[in-house]
Amino acid sequence: MSLEPLPGTLENLLEQTSLKWIFVGGKGGVGKTTTSCSLAIQMSKVRKSVLLISTDPAHNLSDAFGTKFGKEARLIPGFENLSAMEIDPNASIQEMLEQSEQQNPNNPMSGMMQDLAFAIPGIDEALAFAEVMKEVKSMNFDCVIFDTAPTGHTLRFLNFPTVLEKALAKLSGLTSRFGPLINQMSGMLGTNTNQEDIFAKMEGMRGSISEVNKQFKNPDLTTFVCVCISEFLSLYETERMIQELTSYEIDTHNIVVNQLLLDPDTKCPQCIARRKMQQKYLSQIEELYEDFHIVKVPQVPSEVRGTEALTKFSDLLIHPYVKE
Amino acid sequence: MDFLLFLFCLNLFIHLFDKYVKTFLVNQGFRVYARFSGSPEFKSYNDLRLQLLSTKRDLNNVSAQDEFAKWARLNRKFDQLNVKWEKQSKIVSQKSEGVKKLISLTFWIVTRGYRFIVQFKNSGNPVFAVPEGMLPTWALWFLALPKAKTGYVSVAVWNFASQKVISTLL
């Protein structure tokens, strides 16, 4: 099979107008945030409105653009159709729990039910994510780009939507059966239970989780951009991630290889050695992922921070490197 | 006296067999069955296992650092085979459960079943006599259960006593 290698740019993402969700993921320190910001900038040139979301608790978007972002979507200064927000999946679930605690304090039953419900592994992330998705959907953005946490845990719940659904169904079945009993008992004890609200909430979540799932598995709507550097561990992680994504049926056909030394006439001995190593892994990447767009991004001398630097850098995702 | 020793040895043998040999023989018997039964489940299970092992060997021979592409391809193959193998091994273990039960049952009939037949056939025959005046009549009556003459120890009681002693000591 001798196919022409696919063009090494992210232009295919700009051209695919049906795309709604774009995930950018990879190991920590490979330039995920820089890549997702750059991609967002490029997307904003061809789309009506673009939202950039960071689910990384380390919150790098604020650093990258030099503006503080929060849980609400905010326009990035210097852009008219590009907004950003930063969310912390763990914090939002904590908030939700505290809220329901405040609503009905000194209610031992609801606390127990919550403990039971949140014993399902990964449910906190999944619920938080579903919450975010609900919000994002109501905001009506043309395209949403996720800057995922280094481990890619944001996607972990895609692994067990069915488990989750089953567990939730069981739990809600349980309450409908034992709810009256519990109510009676707590009536006798003089406390006031309304554990229904948390389960009603969960039922709602279940719907949105499965809907989100359906959308994520549709390659017309969703794609995942893998970011890596040309080193063994990064490559290894990327391979694992791609296999995982395949098992979740999430489309991925772009790999961004960052921090490459692309100048063939470099003189410093360290650069020559490093370039040699990078070229070795790069050729392996090209051999292994022949059906991917492999975007080679050169290492830039300075930190990519601020709107201007990012805009300049973002060009490298679309136009392949040419030696100056 | 011979009969007494024979029964004791029989009990000892059954005890030792059940404790040390049976599981091994059942497993061996199952392996022989799996090999010669020609059932497609076992065959594909074995094939998969061999493929899995050879892929693993290949994987170990390829340096992930030097030939990442080759290594990753092998790794994908290994993962795929592993999933298939696990699925197949579930099917096989379900099936093997039945076969193993059958083999166990055969062993049971040959050992304990044989003892039962001996006991049943000789239910009227005494094993040895209890010296007169040693035990009260009601105790003698018990020792002769179910059908031996009073004053003698029956096969059933002797078997029971032997089993108790053997299982306590060994």
From Swiss-Prot, chain A:
Active site positions: D56
The entry's Zn(2+)-binding residues are C268, C271
Biological process GO annotation list? Answer: tail-anchored membrane protein insertion into ER membrane
Q: Which GO terms describe its cellular component?
A: GET complex
Query: Is Cell cycle tagged as a keyword?
Result: no
Task: Answer yes or no on keyword Nucleotide-binding.
Answer: yes
Q: Which EC main class describes this enzyme?
A: hydrolase
| One Pfam family hit | ArsA_ATPase
Which compartments is it annotated to reside in? Answer: Cytoplasm; Endoplasmic reticulum
**Which cysteines are cross-linked by disulfides?**
none
Q: Which CDD domains match?
A: ArsA (cd02035)
The UniProt keywords, alphabetically, are:
ATP-binding, Cytoplasm, Endoplasmic reticulum, Hydrolase, Metal-binding, Nucleotide-binding, Transport, Zinc
* UniProt-listed InterPro entries: Anion-transp_ATPase-like_dom, ATPase_ArsA/GET3, ATPase_ArsA/GET3_euk, P-loop_NTPase
EC number(s)? 3.6.-.-
Annotated binding of ATP, by residue: K27, G28, G29, V30, G31, K32, T33, T34, E231, N258
GO MF annotations, alphabetized: ATP binding; ATP hydrolysis activity; identical protein binding; metal ion binding
Q: Which HAMAP family match?
A: Asna1_Get3
NCBIfam families assigned to the protein according to its UniProt record, in alphabetical order: GET3_arsA_TRC40 (TIGR00345)
Membership in a protein family: Belongs to the arsA ATPase family.
Q: How does it assemble?
A: Homodimer.
Known function: ATPase required for the post-translational delivery of tail-anchored (TA) proteins to the endoplasmic reticulum. Recognizes and selectively binds the transmembrane domain of TA proteins in the cytosol. This complex then targets to the endoplasmic reticulum by membrane-bound receptors, where the tail-anchored protein is released for insertion. This process is regulated by ATP binding and hydrolysis. ATP binding drives the homodimer towards the closed dimer state, facilitating recognition of newly synthesized TA membrane proteins. ATP hydrolysis is required for insertion.
Q: What is this protein called?
A: ATPase get3
The species this protein belongs to is Schizosaccharomyces japonicus (strain yFS275 / FY16936)
Swiss-Prot record, chain B:
Q: How does it assemble?
A: Interacts with get3.
Q: Which family does it belong to?
A: Belongs to the WRB/GET1 family.
Coiled-coil regions listed in the entry: none
Kindly report every residue range on the membrane side named Cytoplasmic. Answer: 24-107, 170
GO BP terms in the entry: tail-anchored membrane protein insertion into ER membrane
Q: Which GO terms describe its cellular component?
A: endoplasmic reticulum membrane; GET complex
Per the entry, what this protein does is: Required for the post-translational delivery of tail-anchored (TA) proteins to the endoplasmic reticulum. Acts as a membrane receptor for soluble get3, which recognizes and selectively binds the transmembrane domain of TA proteins in the cytosol.
Q: Which Pfam families match?
A: CHD5 (PF04420)
The protein's location, in the record's own words, is:
Endoplasmic reticulum membrane
The name on file for this protein is Protein get1
Can you tell me where the transmembrane regions are?
Answer: 4-23, 108-128, 153-169
